[in-house]
Curated annotation (Swiss-Prot):
Enzyme Commission identifier(s): 3.1.11.6
Assembly: Heterooligomer composed of large and small subunits.
Catalytic class of the enzyme: hydrolase
InterPro entries, sorted: Exonuc_VII_S, Exonuc_VII_ssu_sf
Stated name of the protein: Exodeoxyribonuclease 7 small subunit
Pfam family, any one: Exonuc_VII_S
Signal sequence interval, chain numbering: none
Family (UniProt): Belongs to the XseB family.
Superkingdom of source: Bacteria
Catalytic activity: Exonucleolytic cleavage in either 5'- to 3'- or 3'- to 5'-direction to yield nucleoside 5'-phosphates
Keywords, sorted A to Z: Cytoplasm, Exonuclease, Hydrolase, Nuclease
Gene name, Swiss-Prot/TrEMBL: xseB
GO biological process: DNA catabolic process
Amino acid sequence: MAKKESYEDMLGKLQDILSTLEDDNLNLEEGMKSYEDGVKLVNKLYKTLNSYEGKISVIKEEKEVEFENQDGDR
């Protein structure tokens, strides 16, 4: 099973793609391929951020319940 790419690794690849797309000597086919790869990476990054946002929300909710229970004990 392949190791899951880190957010930072994917972001680095996206930055490389952006640099490639800014190259004036890039031909159309290479540009389209780079653009497609970039869009795929943006989607992966977006999904990763949404996943972490969901995890953070769950943790916050659990902690809020803990705090509410502690306040009620006093």
